[in-house]
Amino acid sequence: MRESFYILFPIPTYPPPPYGGAVQADGITSANTVGYSGTAINAGQWYLVGVQFADVASKAETADFNSLISTTCTPGAIGDFSDPTWGNAPMIQVLKANGQSYTYYYYISDADDGNGNYTATAWVDDQGFSLTAADVQALSKGFWFKSHTAGTLTCAGQVSTLSEFERNVPGGQFEIVANPYPVALSLNAPTTSGFTPGTIGDFSDPTWNNAPMIQVLKANGQSYSYYYYINDADDGNGNYTATEWVDDQGFNLTGTQVPVGAAFWIKSLTAGKFTFGL
């Protein structure tokens, strides 16, 4: 894969929130359940999108952007190595394994159609080349999306056939995680293992202390909601002995915290694992 070494932001601080749509049955033929989630895209805004679908009939449960995504946003020109965000093409940024920089993809109308004609409208890499097998995205990953024009973003494909899905999270760096199933997520719904619970931060600096931390973009697009993994949460009987995710004041979580089609940031001093289930 051809990768740029330029960073738009090391770890985004205040990007706009994602907007996930409901999942419905699709007309695609498949032995497995097929669905989609839709997002209304505003011009010039960032969206954090969760990968919750794979290519139809994919045994590896992966997808590339040309099969995963369809968009009505206007294709454009890609950036260059002096500034990969310079052009006006819709852009995807995928966090690299180092948790510090991104790989860039662009939506253009003069991509190679496979026959040497540069007339295809497609996602390409940061040099304008067609995507390869190295560019596929796995379920439970996430990516940033931005377009200079308004439109819609639809993620569609095969829903995971696994009744349980494990996602490993490295220690000591930020990671983007998405629910692998196309439903809204309560952070305490998946089984959490490996993470060392700690002490939450405070309002002067919510990242200050040592508890594993999740950040979910708020609907206002200006700030995050913070959640922490601690071992002195209320067990429901007034005993502060439960190990679970809590809000930034240490209170138990209710409802769901991550919308359909969205993803979230997590950082933990120790490596851990989420086990998602249906």
Question: What feature does the model see in each segment?
Answer:
Residues 102-139, 225-258:
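A cross-kingdom feature marking solvent-exposed beta-strand/loop segments within repeated
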Residues 9, 17-88, 96-100, 133-210, ...:
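A short, polar beta-strand/turn micro-motif
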Residues 92-94, 104-106, 123, 145, ...:
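Fold-core signature of tandem repeat domains
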Residues 180-189, 195, 203-258:
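Contiguous ligand/interfacial binding patches
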Residues 76-79, 99, 114-116, 201, ...:
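Small-residue-biased low-complexity repeat regions
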